[in-house]
Amino acid sequence: MSDYKDTLNLPKTSFSMKGNLANKEPMILNKWEKQGIYKKIREHFAGREKFVLHDGPPYANGSIHVGHAVNKILKDIIIKSKTLSGYDAPFTPTWDCHGLPIELQVEKKHGKAGQSISEDDFRKECRKYAKKQVEIQKKDFKRLGVLGDWEQPYLTMNFDYEANMIRTLAKIIENGHLSKGFKPVHWCTDCGSALAEAEVEYADKISPAIDVKFKIKDKDKLAQAFGLDSLNHDAFAIIWTTTPWTLPANQAIAVNNQLNYSLIKIEDFYIILAENLVEQTLKRYAIENAQIIATTTGDKLTGIIAEHPFYSRHVPILHGDHVTDDSGTGLVHTAPTHGVDDFTLGKEHNLSMEIFVKGNGCYSENTKLFAGEFIFKANDRIIELLGEKKRLMNSDKIKHSYPHCWRHKTPLMFRATPQWFISMEKQGLRNKALQAIKETSWAPSWGQARIEGMVKDRPDWCISRQRTWGVPLPLFIHKETEELHPNTIEILHKVAEKIEKGGIEAWFNADDCEFITETAQYKSVKDTLDVWFDSGSSSMCILDLDKRLSYPADLYLEGSDQHRGWFQTSLLVAMSAKGSQPYKEVFTHGFVVDEHGRKMSKSLGNVTSPQDIYNTLGADILRLWTASTDYKSEMAVSDQILKRTADTYRRLRNTARFLLSNLDGFNPATDIIEFDKLVKLDQWAIAKTKEFQDKIIEAYDKYQTHTVAQLIHHFCSIEMGSFYLDIIKDRQYTAKTDGHPRKSAQTAIYHIVHALVRWMAPILSFTADEIWDATPKTTDLPIQLCEWYTGLKSFDQDAELDLEYWAKIQEIRSEVNRVLEIKRNEDVVKASLEAEITIYADKDNYKLLEKLGNELRFLLISSKADLKVIEESTSSSIAANIPGLSIEITKIEEPKCERCWHRSSTVGDNPQYKDICSRCVENITTEAGESREFA
């Protein structure tokens, strides 16, 4: 037996079978660094239509987690796909660098600002810490294969950014949106500062729920209100509250004029409850022998005076629109300094706004009985005192949703303090923002309703904070009237110039006289700006000023929590400073959870870190998982899920390797065959690739990365792996090296590889770079500078063997393979090349198959295939799952060709080549080799 190995076209490529990504990717990154690849992209696409995806700044504190990785990878995929579409799509990373988390880290090492360390040195340490964190996170983002202007990122602590924030504030003030107010705001006792809406998260909390008796001072007036002559016992207005600690600040009781109220006799006293709540409230009190004496409307009760339950203080009953009879008692305890509705009612009726609680959460010295106590700890003492005073009607516990600090996870309080606000009403900001939301494209579409609801209901934006590490609110107010300095805008621009040279420290270290001359009349505000103002100003500080970018951004892409965060603050800053929305389109992705849908938590032990993934599996596996997951909802990840992703990756890599290995010796400059002259199956492969490319580009344009991933996988495993590549192996390996059949397949493979590597490039950035290096090409451009492949062709409309035709052939082939599997299990044949396949077909199917002539066997990967009419089918044939078709498979008895392994009666016909078939002899000995028309 001769050795025909040297006569075969064995596959050969530099593209390895194993990815070994964890080791290879850093080398590829190093290559990109040396090439200056991002700079080259910018130069190559300069002058093209821009596409700007504006990066929402992550916070510069700690290593990135998998949520950060998902966000940056999705952005990178979109940017790279837009580059392939020919856009100039720059990506400038940003970081959020001021605020409390950084202060807390610095405090751990150096102590509190102004105590163990000077405020100036504290800020220097904060700046140093933030810079270090940026470098740590930057390294991780780059390791993920994310391309961007990493050398010139935007940091909110950059001097020019800090200065431009002040200029943005000046525009907002100039446009009349700033207001000063004494209002209740969410206050964190741990932060020692007011919080913005975006910094508040709701969590379940168990609180005391008590019903408190307020004794009515004038019983005769109450009797009159209920249409009675007199009352012979004491009467009490009953309020229900879950915040006993606010009772020292109580100044009134609110009822609703439109509601009905009942006077109820219980033993030797009366109580007042909303009529609709009587039954459930008495049930809660476990009182059965109560008697409803009379009913009246809320407006008859207003003006009646009650007595505070433990202070000598008159408490009026007042009308409040916010009062309902859905729960509680229908009478609402009102502490003007501890609630928005309470505050509004207090302002309306000129109630006392005395402050009873300090910023640290302890009662102030003027709080009788409880001075110095921490408010939440005082709840029990207050309940105990109410019991002693016979003013406690009922005491219980309730589990309810309660506002917490997003950083400390501790309960918040509403606390009225003097603060600076961006008014939602003064210049119609709320309505303008709502209109801008309507003019923006939101995906998923429910995002629009979500942010609309938030903007409709949100209070004025409290932009002042009482922090050390933050951009100043550099205002000057009159010492007596507290009015803003008349030259505020001019002063702010002067401050901005100073900050641009020396950072925020230039303001904090300066004397007032450096900015104003009237220091006897005016004083500087010592507050800092809310950090959400920092990130919210990015459209003004970056997009509006950087000529490499554009305003508004084409796209904002962040987690779904940003409807209440960055999407909203960006909108409010842009609308109040510039009068237009900062984005055209807003996309959101879900949170990353484990395979059981649980949040990542160290305590649960279910944290998957991006560092672990790229150090073991490789960044491309993380990128493929990200792209493959429908990110509009929660994104589940685990070791098992990543293992499945790695399996998918291997299939994609193997497909690429097979394609590349069959391009050995192919020179695109000289070997490409025109479409019309290709073997018909190769024409199909190119047309099918074109069909998939159109779908893939459409999916990329819609940011549907999971659809892209599904299409690429289907293309590689089904259209290529299970059909085309399976069929052409014989032709590729055994045909004449430079003969038409092989060059035809190589031409198709060349086009397929050039399309496929571009489809993969946004997602599998490292692998695509590897594929590109191993691909024959006529360009020196790196893959990152390429656009979608234009060498593909579709069938003409009048093509006889079009995509529809080949789809039917694929169906028939699948049925043949099904029957083959049956015969394998029956030990009739071991492999398809041992099979003699007879297809019995009705008229329509016969017409389809006869076009392939004697090349049908190549499509079925068998040594012999016969086509007969259905009427000739035998009892041993098996009916196909296609009407009008049955299949018979028997073992072929002819000898095996030692070169192509086909069974053929022609083996040994040539005495010089006794162990190979005539087809192989032709491919070895003739100049042209065999000919193929269809497969």
UniProtKB/Swiss-Prot annotation:
The keyword Transmembrane does not apply. ATP binds at K602. It catalyses: tRNA(Ile) + L-isoleucine + ATP = L-isoleucyl-tRNA(Ile) + AMP + diphosphate. One of its GO terms (cellular component) is cytosol. Its cofactor is Zn(2+). Its EC number is 6.1.1.5. GO terms for biological process: isoleucyl-tRNA aminoacylation. Signal peptide: none annotated. PANTHER family: ISOLEUCINE--TRNA LIGASE, MITOCHONDRIAL, SOLEUCYL-TRNA SYNTHETASE. This is Isoleucine--tRNA ligase. It comes from Francisella tularensis subsp. novicida (strain U112). The lineage of its organism: Bacteria, Pseudomonadati, Pseudomonadota, Gammaproteobacteria, Thiotrichales.
